[in-house]
From Swiss-Prot:
This is Protein arginine N-methyltransferase 5. The active site is at E499, E508. One of its GO terms (biological process) is locomotory behavior. It comes from Caenorhabditis elegans. PROSITE patterns: SAM_MT_PRMT (PS51678). It is found in: Nucleus. Residues 541-589 are annotated as: Dimerization. The keyword Transport does not apply. Changing F379M: Significantly elevates methylase activity, and converts PRMT5 to an enzyme catalyzing both symmetric and asymmetric arginine dimethylation.
Length: 734
């Protein structure tokens, strides 16, 4: 007697055995042998999930009581799941006729015909398509609301993990209001797929004469907003793809918007398939390109919806559909990954940046907080950055050494655990080998200034073990260096070297730190870096916006200091607590973050510069700044904020950059900064947006304040609130 379950029947036994054999043997998937090709196909069968949507064409007698058999047959055709009407097909495909006696059939989809775990894993419950809560007929709208609630309740009863609801209108405020209340107030966490029509012209309320600036994306974005912008983990969108692709699914800048949305699935209509060379079902190239472009992860789902009854008399067509769909996308996600295997020198190999995708990180504040060994260790993995620093030091030594001098005094300001110190001493050797052969060597006299007492332990060890006691180590805040140097009789520097930059350039207070040593410098002292500039670019990312807004503070972390001006204090119970008078959500949204951006798109082709600082600052120029940066929007979108970058001129033409167009190849020391808005701002094609940003300074710290002004094409202006006033949420202490 067989011990196989329904789940096992989704794939033939031999496939599972082949997969187990491959996994146990540990064989490489790179072989091009026929057996490996078969294995890759079977791996795609389990890795890429293709579902079948039950339609009127599937209706058979007592189908609602034979769901297990229906699913098992689909499994034989390589379908991993089914999208099935939650009330059953009899109820789902009922046709209202306007009669008062005409009532929809009751929900009649018995739960005991499948194990609970199979309902959860293999069935997506679809809301009956006749339900229209936004109908112009008040009675039918009310009836629809009543039965939508019944079907939502039954989804919870069955314990389904996912449900689908198909929008048939451009505007569905009443449907959104019902869903909004349900998802926000019920303790039920199923995922909602909001299925869009294949084209805006398919909407019941479409009117070519009155509809302007509306497309499929705006239908989704408005519905998402009307549902309270619920978490994209549980509230997602499904695109319907038919034979005719609308312009917004062929024009790249419009297609890209879906990369910034919680895209869950593609509903593929069978009518788009064509006959291939051998007569098998094939997908047109335009549709393949669309799927590949949006296939950012194998967690996406594809659903086949039959629009013709071909599958009833062509028994192989179902398999051909699923095979063609898997073939279209099976290698996309793998090909897009960088090769970081054996022999690769890609920096991402050892930093594992993939783990940081879309993870929010607070910018470091090394001036007010001492870094730990693990942070230093992470920095030190990026050899490319240190190599470029070495190149800059060699360039400066070449210029200074041209007069034949024997000694150059270098101060490393902020030594950390010493990697730049090591690079400076190697640069001395490189300079002498290149430019002083047959002459007296140039000697670097190196001082390292570091305020972190813990890192001083490492620096002293390095001085004995690696640097042969050549370095003078000064344990001090660099801003105290002029006084210390005067007391101890230290020489003035010919070169100062520092690495004090954050993801937005000056946001780790490099200007304030370096200004503190200006009085100790010679008029000819070279600073490495000489100049740095921050840049911004508007971005769209529903995921990042929701992630920032949803942050919460665990009870045991409630006294951890905020990133703002406020400090922890004792409450009435003598317990330490960090208070947020501005509110937790506003506190979250009024900060700058560091993020390895993935689920986002830029809304401008190029960045624009913001703040520039040059060193040494002999003119004692103020470090306060104010700027207005304007961008013209080229599509309808939701602006969530700005990505921030910087570049720095280390010495003359030697540069480091994370600005996208000039990014230093292979360097991963800095991820982009994100400057969020409190709420996503809807922008239209042709709108002008201006980021107004100030860098403010007082006696104890530095902060940014920012807001956006939007000018629409009709001249109407909108301004967002000023964020982070007086540094209440994000304050960089000096």
């Amino acid at each position: 007697m067989s011990n196989r379950t329904y789940a096992d029947n989704l794939f033939p036994q031999q496939v599972a055995e082949q997969h187990e054999e491959q996994m146990s043997s540990g064989s490489s998937p790179k072989s091009n042998s026929p057996s490996r090709s078969i294995s890759s196909v079977e791996a795609a069968n389990s890795r890429i999930h293709i579902g079948w949507m039950a339609t009127t064409l599937d209706v058979a007698e007592n189908l609602d009581r034979h769901v297990a058999t229906f699913c098992t047959r689909l499994g034989e055709f390589k379908y991993n799941f089914v999208v099935y009407p939650i009330g059953g097909v009899v109820r789902a495909f009922w046709t209202p006729n306007g009669s008062a006696e005409n009532h929809p059939p009751v929900i009649d989809l018995p739960d005991v015909q499948l194990r609970n775990d199979l309902w959860e894993s293999y069935v997506v419950g679809k809301i009956s398509p006749w339900i229209d809560c936004d109908s112009s007929d008040p009675a039918f709208a009310s009836l629809s609301e009543e039965h939508l609630l019944k079907e939502l309740s039954y989804i919870c009863y069955l314990g389904l993990q996912t449900m689908a609801i198909e929008l048939t209108r451009i505007s569905s405020p009443r449907t959104a209001a019902i869903l909004k209340k349900w998802i926000w107030t019920r303790n039920s966490r199923f995922t909602v797929w909001v299925q869009l029509p294949s084209a805006i012209e398919k909407c019941k309320d479409y009117d070519a004469f009155t509809i302007e600036h509306v497309d499929l994306w705006t239908i989704w974005a408005d519905f998402r907003k009307n549902c309270g912008n619920f978490s994209g983990v549980y509230f997602q969108v499904a695109l319907t793809i038919s034979s005719e692709l609308p312009d917004e699914l062929t024009e790249l800048k419009l297609v890209d918007r879906w990369k910034a949305e919680p895209l869950a699935a593609f509903v593929i209509e069978s009518g788009l398939f064509i006959s291939g060379r051998n007569g098998e079902a094939s997908i047109p190239s335009a549709h393949i390109n669309l799927l590949k472009h949006l296939w950012t992860t194998d967690a996406l789902r594809i659903v086949l919806r039959a629009t013709t009854d071909t599958f009833k008399y062509n028994t192989s067509i179902k398999s051909e559909y699923s095979q063609a769909l898997r073939h279209a996308v099976r290698n996309v996600n793998y090909r897009s990954r960088p090769d970081v295997g054996e022999g690769s020198n890609d920096s991402t190999h050892y930093l594992n940046v993939i783990e940081y995708k879309d993870v929010l990180q607070a910018p470091l504040q090394p001036l007010s907080e001492n870094l730990d060994s693990g942070v230093y260790n992470t920095f030190e993995q990026d050899q490319i950055k240190y190599d470029v620093y070495g190149e800059a030091v060699v360039g400066a030594l070449k210029d200074l050494g041209a007069d034949g001098r024997k000694t150059v005094v270098i101060y490393l300001l902020g030594g950390g655990r010493g990697p730049i110190g090591t690079k400076i001493l190697k640069s001395e050797r490189e300079y002498n080998n290149t430019f002083r052969q047959g002459q007296e060597s140039l000697k670097v006299k190196l001082y390292i200034v570091e305020k972190n007492p813990n890192a001083i332990v490492t620096l002293k060890y390095m001085n004995v073990r690696t640097w042969k006691r050549r370095v003078t180590i000064i344990e001090s805040d660099m801003r105290s260096l002029p006084g210390i140097a005067k007391d101890r009789g230290f020489e003035q520097p010919d070169i100062i070297v520092s690495e004090l930059l954050g993801s937005f350039g000056d946001n780790e207070l490099s200007p304030e730190c370096l200004d503190g040593v200006t009085g100790f410098l010679k008029p000819t002292t070279i600073s490495i870096p000489q100049k740095y500039t921050s840049y911004v670019k508007p971005i769209m990312s529903t995921h990042i916006h929701q992630t920032i807004k949803a942050q919460s503070i665990p009870y045991l972390s409630r006294a951890i200091p905020s990133h703002g001006r406020g400090e922890p204090e004792l409450d009435e119970d003598e317990m330490w607590i960090q208070k947020y008078p501005q509110g937790h959500v506003r506190n979250n949204m009024d900060q700058i973050y560091v993020v390895y951006l993935s689920k986002y798109i830029p809304l401008a082709e190029t960045t624009k510069p913001v703040f520039t600082f040059e060193h040494p600052n002999f003119m004692n120029s103020s470090n306060e700044r104010s700027d207005s940066i304007e961008f013209v929007m080229d599509r309808n979108a939701d602006l969530m904020g700005f990505a921030g970058y910087f570049d720095l001129q280390l010495y003359k033409t030697v540069m480091l950059s994370i600005e996208p167009s000039t990014h230093t190849p292979g360097m991963v020391s800095w991820f982009p900064a994100v400057i969020p808005l409190r709420d996503q701002l809807r922008v239209g094609e042709g709108d002008r947006i201006s980021l107004k940003i100030d860098r403010k300074v007082d006696n104890t710290g530095v902060w940014y304040e920012w807001h956006v002004e939007k000018k629409k094409t009709n001249g109407e202006s909108v301004s967002t609130p000023i964020q982070n006033p007086n540094g209440e949420s994000y304050y960089m202490r000096m």
